[in-house]
Amino acid sequence: MRVSAADRVEILDVVGRADAAATRRDARAYADLFTADAVLDGTQGRHVGSAALLDSVGPIWAAEGPATLHLTLNPVVYPGDGPDEAVVQSILLIIDPAQPITIRTAAASTQTLRRHGATWRISRRTVAPATQPS
């Protein structure tokens, strides 16, 4: 099974918009990119459902400091379990933009997206410590 070029563009747009919303600390815009039954999990806990997601991201972002940039690096899109599902693996880099610029976090991100009508939405986002290549 393959993910079409048009779907890849839409999927990567959703992933990029999620990190842009996180940078702006816009919890509503962030949550709107997820399915109603979405799961966000990783080192900051496990949050299930869009309401829990909306409530949890504020404290998660606040723990990063007053301002951070969320950057998605090297995203690769893979087919998911069905024709309306895709998986994106990438590196999430969280940067403190104050001088001197510092990297706050480098993490491995795996996101599952499902087609929801004519759009794609994140159904699962797992953030884990980045590992060194062997």
Q: PLM features: residue spans?
A:
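Short, cysteine-centered beta-strand-loop-beta hairpins and adjacent loop/turn segments enriched
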Residues: 94-104
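Charge-dense, low-complexity intrinsically disordered segments
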Residues: 1, 5, 44-47, 100
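Short aromatic-glycine motifs in intrinsically disordered, low-complexity regions
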Residues: 63-64, 101-102, 114
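Short, surface-exposed coil-to-beta transition loops
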Residues: 70-72, 104-109
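Short, low-complexity N-terminal intrinsically disordered segments enriched in polar/charged residues
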Residues: 1-36
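Short beta-strand edge/turn micro-motifs at domain boundaries
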Residues: 85-87, 106-134
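A solvent-exposed, acidic/Ser-Thr-rich amphipathic alpha-helical stretch
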Residues: 12, 27-94
